[in-house]
């Protein structure tokens, strides 16, 4: 699965790796962070649940369906995080921002939870409120999402994923 692929390649880059999910469907293979709002499928709920598990630290978040983000992009974001007081460091390419990839500081947990409780599930709103820092990338390919099974299959055929 994409989860296994992402975990295997990203684990060496971090002190710890956690999988955010609504329920344990991995049979104990991963350290999990379970979403705290049952029945609500939202990146804001997931982000709040994730950040509530950490204290005074940046947490790198990446959607499982973005398998082309590599160490190079992660390091570029981390370098900016080390130099700025901002609580969110997010990649941006020529087309758009990528809020499902980036470093979020754990101090954002209360704001993320508040927005989730208010049913405001747009990460862009959180990023606006916290004054996120955007890191520009010329190449958009690393931030491509595989939103459908056929996109995943096509990537396998093209050997984009190995």
Q: What spans do the regions from the language model cover?
A:
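Terminal amphipathic alpha-helical/low-complexity segments used for targeting or macromolecular assembly
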Residues: 158-162
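Nucleotide and nucleotide-moiety/phosphate-recognizing core
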Residues: 1-120, 125-142, 150, 154-157
């Amino acid at each position: 699965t994409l989860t296994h692929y992402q975990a295997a390649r990203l684990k060496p880059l971090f002190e710890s790796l956690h999988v955010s999910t609504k329920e344990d469907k991995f049979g104990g293979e991963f350290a999990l962070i379970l979403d705290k709002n049952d029945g609500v499928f939202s990146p804001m709920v997931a982000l709040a649940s994730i950040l509530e598990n950490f204290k005074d630290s940046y947490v790198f978040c990446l959607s499982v369906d973005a398998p082309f983000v590599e160490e190079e992009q992660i390091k570029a974001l981390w370098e900016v995080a080390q130099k700025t007081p901002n609580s969110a460091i997010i990649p941006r390419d020529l087309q758009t921002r990528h809020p499902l990839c980036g470093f979020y500081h754990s101090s954002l947990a209360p704001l993320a939870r508040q927005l989730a409780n208010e049913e405001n599930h747009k990460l862009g709103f959180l990023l606006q409120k916290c004054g996120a820092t955007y890191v520009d990338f010329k190449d958009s390919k690393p931030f491509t999402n595989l939103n459908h099974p056929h996109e995943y299959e096509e990537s396998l055929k093209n050997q984009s994923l190995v």
